[in-house]
Curated annotation (Swiss-Prot):
PANTHER family: KERATIN-ASSOCIATED PROTEIN 19-3-RELATED, KERATIN-ASSOCIATED PROTEIN 19-4-RELATED. The gene is Krtap19-4. One of its GO terms (cellular component) is intermediate filament. Interacts with hair keratins. This is Keratin-associated protein 19-4. Transmembrane segments: none annotated. Residues 9-78 are annotated as: 24 X 2 AA repeats of G-[YCGS].
Length: 84
């Protein structure tokens, strides 16, 4: 199910990742200032729904946004209803 409030704890609706300074639903590990729902790992300023590695495409694995996509990584970006 969705991984809200998971892992080490960042800011946001359900951030997961250590010290994600982003806001939105489910910031990833090391997210610095991304906004949107579900930023991914180490994406600086990535915005959108469920961003992956730190870009903004449309529903990509790494670096795409599109809420509800799946990413089998603990730090790899979880969106609106992603699966681990």
């Amino acid at each position: 199910m969705s991984y809200y409030n998971s892992y080490y704890g960042g800011l946001g609706y359900g951030s997961g990742g250590y010290g994600g300074l982003g806001y939105g639903y489910g910031c990833g590990c090391g997210s610095f200032r991304r906004l949107g729902y579900g930023c991914g790992f180490g994406g600086y300023g990535g915005f959108g729904y469920g961003s992956g590695y730190g870009g903004f495409s449309s529903g990509s694995g790494y670096g795409g946004f599109g809420y509800g996509y799946r990413r089998p990584l603990s730090y790899g970006g979880y969106g609106f209803s992603t699966f681990y």
